[in-house]
């Protein structure tokens, strides 16, 4: 039974005063200050075999890191001392590990099998999860088959997901990742930005009669989402006004509008009253729960657009992939626990090597939005400066996460990683086979893609010495610019193919990595008060922009900028 946080979440000794922390500082300063990866491999012929783990379909190679066996042992001791495993078990049990909001954190329940028992406040939540999944599957099947039609009786051809944050980044990332598995007769578009241009571009070539909107907002009060949804409703009604059913053409009034809206809008929310006020039939409202954080939610009802695109069976394959890594994280011993190892390696660089960022570099065009998704997952979770006890931390927490798909990045910012002055640990994600959808000619390009994949990690690790440059006959004045010191740490994640299951495994791997780091840093990885502050201030400032109203409490800089904005806005109108 879940309940208020107890022993694992009580007062913690100051992290940097722990003997396990100071042992790592000493190790960094004395034992392994500047390990050369060339030397580490030369002195340990088994290093490549020993420094790798398997989790589900994922092979994770961490041999190209600035570590030795002692480093790993010390990091494991830090994990034990900070009770990472106790926190992990408490999360899986449904305890309220989100301490600032007093909530359970159970995104793992979203992919639990039907016969699992996971309790929140004494109630098994798994049946409710599967009830929603079954309703989603029924609705998705009706849209995909053409049984569900729009107000005029025409088949739905485009689904527009309106959400923001976790209600957009997750499903948008997964839709791109699994595009090879989508129904090509259906298109899904995503609208998130309150900038009207986002909605305009999404709708400009669509037929309202063939468009279905999914409005994703837990409270149905998210300002960006409801603003866009209201504009989308106006667009729909205006478009259908000239093409309604026979006998209804040009009809106006709430009843006619409600009929149209009910056939073209569904909601992902828990606020039935607000959903009904909007005109959406609450029978087409799919709920989720307060123990699911937005950035962990695309495998809940938030993923309805994805389920419509790839079908319920593929969606369940993805959930099964999540569950594989959940179980791995929950049960694998520390020395072979992939999320634990990845999390601890990040701490090694962020806290003991002063690395400020972390690059995630997928060698797959389909993962073009994967790093953007991880930015929210990691930076919103661990971008904190106060610990669980309310004290300002005095150690680095979450890194800046960035990256784009290879090989594009090689012709942009890899230069800085190779020869710049910053230490940037990087994850390289690749696949042994291209997706089956490709023609044989295009499949043949996959080996070239992966040749770059392996070459980059080798070059980053081992570089190119001045002697090797001279051996090529390079003039002496050109030797220094063409020398690569190497020693840039990378993790290689290799899977057979990008499938729904493998995508679920990848996302769960990073979810639990983020959890591990938050546990060590003693921060709450599941709130996001920085996001909330911005929302409050935006509501205060908006009347000054739209109406010219005085807003008390604006600082002089912002007040002056608001006045400039108003002047420029009015000048253009004239």
Please give the residue ranges for each predicted region.
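Extended, charge-enriched "interface" segments that sit outside catalytic cores
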Residues: 9-152, 444-473, 517, 553-557, ...
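General structural feature for long, well-ordered alpha-helical segments within catalytic domains
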Residues: 20, 33, 47, 67-74, ...
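Short helix/loop capping segments that flank catalytic or ligand/cofactor-binding pockets
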Residues: 49-50, 169-172, 199-200, 223-225, ...
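Glycine-rich phosphate-binding loops that contact phosphosugars or nucleotide phosphates
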Residues: 138-146, 152-332
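Short glycine-rich or small-residue beta-strand-to-loop segments that form or flank ligand, phosphate
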Residues: 157-163, 213-219, 357-364, 400-401, ...
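Short, solvent-exposed amphipathic alpha-helical segments in soluble enzyme
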Residues: 174-179, 204-208, 229-232, 282-283, ...
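Active-site phosphate/pyrophosphate-binding segments
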Residues: 238-245, 254-438, 463, 486, ...
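C-terminal accessory domains/tails appended to large, multi-domain proteins
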Residues: 484-488, 492-521, 526, 533, ...
């Amino acid at each position: 039974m879940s309940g208020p946080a107890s022993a694992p979440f009580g007062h913690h000794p100051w992290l940097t005063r722990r003997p396990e922390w100071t042992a790592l500082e000493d190790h960094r300063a004395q034992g392994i200050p500047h390990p050369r990866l060339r030397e580490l491999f030369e002195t340990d012929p088994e290093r490549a075999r020993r420094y790798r783990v398997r989790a589900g379909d994922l092979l994770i190679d961490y041999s190209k890191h600035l570590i030795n066996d002692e480093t790993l042992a010390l990091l494991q001791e830090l994990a034990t001392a900070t009770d990472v495993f106790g926190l992990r078990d408490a999360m899986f049990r449904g305890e309220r590990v989100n301490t600032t909001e007093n909530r359970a954190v159970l995104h793992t329940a979203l992919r639990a099998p039907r016969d699992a028992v996971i309790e929140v406040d004494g109630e098994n939540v798994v049946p409710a999860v599967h009830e929603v999944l079954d309703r989603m599957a029924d609705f998705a099947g009706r849209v995909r088959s053409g049984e569900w039609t729009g107000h005029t009786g025409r088949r739905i051809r485009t689904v527009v997901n309106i959400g923001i944050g976790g209600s957009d980044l997750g499903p948008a990332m997964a839709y791109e990742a699994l595009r090879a598995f989508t129904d090509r007769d259906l298109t899904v578009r995503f609208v998130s930005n309150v900038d009207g241009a986002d909605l305009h571009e999404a709708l400009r070539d669509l037929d309202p009669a063939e468009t279905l909107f999914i409005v994703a907002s837990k409270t149905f009060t998210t300002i960006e989402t409801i603003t866009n949804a209201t504009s989308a409703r106006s667009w729909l009604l205006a478009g259908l006004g000239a093409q309604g059913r026979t006998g209804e053409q040009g009809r106006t009034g709430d009843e006619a509008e409600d009929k149209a809206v009910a056939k073209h809008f569904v909601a992902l929310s828990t606020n039935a009253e607000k959903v009904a006020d909007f005109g959406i039939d609450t029978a087409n409202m799919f709920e989720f729960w307060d123990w699911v954080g937005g950035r962990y939610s695309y495998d809940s009802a938030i993923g309805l657009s994805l389920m419509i695109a790839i079908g319920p069976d593929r969606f369940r394959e993805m959930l099964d992939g999540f569950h594989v890594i959940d179980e791995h994280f929950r049960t694998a011993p520390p020395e072979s626990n992939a999320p634990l190892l990845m999390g601890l390696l990040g701490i090694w660089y962020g806290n003991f090597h002063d690395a400020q960022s972390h690059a995630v570099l997928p060698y797959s065009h389909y993962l073009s939005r994967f790093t953007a998704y991880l930015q929210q997952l990691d930076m919103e979770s661990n971008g904190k400066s106060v610990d669980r006890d309310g004290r300002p931390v005095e150690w680095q927490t979450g890194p800046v996460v960035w990256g784009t798909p290879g090989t594009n990045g090689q012709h942009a910012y890899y230069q800085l990683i190779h020869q710049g002055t910053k230490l940037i640990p990087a994850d390289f994600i690749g696949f042994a086979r291209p997706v089956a959808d490709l023609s044989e000619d295009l499949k043949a390009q996959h080996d070239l893609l992966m040749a770059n994949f392996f070459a980059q990690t080798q070059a980053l690790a081992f570089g190119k010495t001045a002697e090797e440059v001279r051996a090529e006959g390079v003039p002496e004045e050109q030797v220094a610019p063409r020398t690569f010191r190497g020693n840039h740490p990378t993790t290689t994640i290799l899977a057979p193919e990008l499938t729904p299951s493998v995508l679920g495994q990848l996302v769960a791997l990073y979810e639990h990595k983020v959890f591990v780091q938050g546990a060590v840093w003693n921060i709450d990885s599941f709130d996001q008060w920085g996001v909330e502050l911005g929302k409050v201030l935006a509501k205060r400032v908006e009347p000054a922009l739209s109406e010219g109203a005085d807003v008390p409490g604006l600082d002089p800089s912002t007040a002056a900028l608001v006045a400039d904005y108003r002047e420029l806005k009015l000048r253009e109108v004239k």
